[in-house]
Every structure is written in C-alpha cells, then in structure tokens.
Curated annotation (Swiss-Prot):
GO biological process terms, semicolon-separated: cellular detoxification of nitrogen compound; D-amino acid metabolic process; putrescine catabolic process
One cellular-component annotation, GO: cytosol
Lineage: Eukaryota, Fungi, Dikarya, Ascomycota, Taphrinomycotina
Superkingdom to which the source organism belongs: Eukaryota
Family classification: Belongs to the acetyltransferase family.
Residues the record marks as site: Important for catalytic activity: 136
EC number(s) per entry: 2.3.1.-
Matches recorded under Pfam families: Acetyltransf_1 (PF00583)
Protein name in the entry: N-acetyltransferase ats1
InterPro entries noted in UniProt: Acyl_CoA_acyltransferase (IPR016181), Diverse_Substrate_AcTransf (IPR051016), GNAT_dom (IPR000182)
Alphabetic keyword roster: Acyltransferase, Cytoplasm, Nucleus, Transferase
Source organism: Schizosaccharomyces pombe (strain 972 / ATCC 24843) (Fission yeast)
Role noted for this protein: N-acetyltransferase that may act on a wide range of D-amino acids. May also acetylate histones, polyamines like putrescine, spermidine and spermine, and certain other small basic proteins like nuclear HMG proteins.
Length: 168
C-alpha cells in the first residue's frame, strides 16, 4: 500500500465519477439502469453556478490513483431532529479490495456525520453482497429490522404525481 488519502470530488473528477458509477452498476448487475450523465452530475454536485449541491463525493486514492469512491447526501431524522448522512454508493475497484479502503471511506463518512452534528450514517446493501455486509457489520452497522426500502419510478411516479388535485 503506497500513499493513501481521501479527498473530495471536484468538477474535473466527474468523468472518473461517471466511470466509477458504470463500474459499480456492472458489479451490481444493473448496467442497463444507468441513466447518469456528466452534465447531470455537475448539477447534483453543485458545480453549476447558483446550484445547491444535493450530492457529495469523496475518492480514496492510492498513489494519486482513484481506488474507491463514496457518494452521499444529507438526510434528516424527525425522531432525533438531527441531520445525518445517507451513503448512496460505496465502490472500491477490484484491484484495491482487501486493503481496508471501504472501511476507511465509512470511517470518513462517520466523522463527517459527527462534524455536521449528525447522529447516524444510513445506507442499503444488496442482500447477495455478503462481503460488503461483513465489512459493514465489522464497522458496527446493524441491519434495521422491520423496515423495507420502497421506491416509485417511471410511469408509476408520474401516475402518483397526477393523483394530486390541481388546486394543490
């Protein structure tokens, strides 16, 4: 392991962020679901003038080469009335796995959550990704029993939006 550092994503990194997204989608067997574009990432990360970022990202680098990435956003708990961090994606390239880089990224985000007054770090993991589950449990994460992730997309999202009466 050479020189290792974690740093924030900058605008010039967006092609690499996009590449990581495609690599993650391939790993998760979801390549056909990637709709991301570099212009959309510019907006999401707030790299367009007067646009508030809705996503943040960090790279872990080995010898100045991107080895892994975490993309996250702020969330809020009504129960604690505190901000937190939701980890959207964590990906370590295959040749860099087994070096603790995923754990370092989790620790970085835990520190960031505490820095902003947060009380937790949330994410979901594919149920077949046993290696990741083991890393997360070793880091102190627990499965949240009794909860199921829900999602509305595409035509169902439009249909749901259309159910709201026009006077709203």
């Amino acid at each position: 392991m050479g020189s290792v550092r974690i740093r924030s994503v900058i605008k010039e990194d967006l092609p690499t962020v996009y590449q990581f997204i495609k690599e993650l989608a391939e790993f998760e067997k979801c390549e056909d679901q990637v709709e991301a574009t570099i212009p959309n990432l510019e907006v999401a990360f707030g790299f367009i003038d007067e646009v508030t970022p809705v996503a943040y990202g960090v790279f872990i680098e080995e010898n100045d080469q991107p080895a892994g990435m975490a993309i996250y956003f702020l969330n809020f708990s009504t129960w604690t009335s505190r901000v937190g961090i939701y980890l959207e994606d964590l990906y370590v390239r295959p040749q860099f796995r087994g070096k603790g880089y995923g754990s370092y990224l989790l620790s970085y985000l835990a520190r960031e959550s505490l820095r902003i007054g947060g009380r937790r770090l949330d994410w979901v993991v594919l149920d077949w990704n046993q290696r990741a589950i083991e890393v997360y449990e070793k880091a102190g994460a627990q499965k949240v029993g009794g909860w199921s992730m829900m999602r509305v997309t595409g035509e169902n999202l439009k249909a749901l939006a259309d159910k709201l009466p026009g006077n709203f």
